[in-house]
Amino acid sequence: MLKDSFSSASVFMGLSLLLLALVLFGASQGALKISFDALFDEEYRDIWLNIRLPRVLLAVLVGAALATAGVIMQGLFRNPMADPGLLGVSSGSALMVGVAIVLPFSFPVVLVLYEQMVFAIAGSLVVCTVIFLITQRHRDGSMMQLLLAGIAINALCGAAIGILSYIGDEQQLRQLTLWMMGNLGQAQWPTLLVASSFILPAIMATTCLAGTLNLLQLGDEEAHYLGVNVKRKRQQLLLISSLLVGAAVSVSGIIGFIGLVIPHLIRMTTGANHRWLIPCSALAGACLLLMADTLARTLVQPAEMPVGLLTSLLGGPYFMWLILRNRRIT
């Protein structure tokens, strides 16, 4: 046990140092490279502080949020294939953001910054609830049934987004397209502050529920006998995962597979104890998305690739390998 804790702590420290290095490196890269010495120049310092740093920190937040949501969903459904993108949760959030973009809604000035986030969280909460009800109704349902439900939800949300694209104007269509591919180019300090006000408390709340997630892996009856209010804790976890996915999608669009890939990789190194799995997954998700976004900004300069394309290129093959691996096991 002590050896396992030491190993997990080493992984946590290593990921923390890697994230710090990636933040410093990512903030210096782009069409205009900014060295440490250049920060003494006012023009370069303004670019670094108001353009580069908010984007880098937003990538950290979104990556951590998606990875943490993946840990919650895999623990909540006790299914290694559970992921915000595959189950349609991200699509539900994106659909509601599309509704906020295309259809006219009037919000008080104080709530304008929160408009898309409120819609995105509502969309993710609805989809999470539907998936949860499906799993509760068919407790003996297979992994394939869960994936088929996700495919159906993704298809419905995709069709609805297509309708919104059809009735929207040219500017709204462009905004929706960027949203569907995943993009962090709109990062600003106000956006970062709004996102962090949802994501950071949700990650901390998830960490506090790590013991509950460990007990839920034993099954609902066993967890109940050990003193867990299963229904209430599942509702809390469902709400937290909806907050994480909704807040992430509202500022970045759909970025897939981080919630699938990262928990699996971290579980291989730290084991299934959620007390280490949650914080290490959050750090690893932040590292992965930050690396992907840095590549997206530098591969085709001066243009930028949508970061969602890069994460899909990574996650797609991993997902196929995971399906083949589980088929061989069964």
State where each predicted segment sits.
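Alpha-helical transmembrane segments in inner-membrane proteins
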Residues: M1-T330
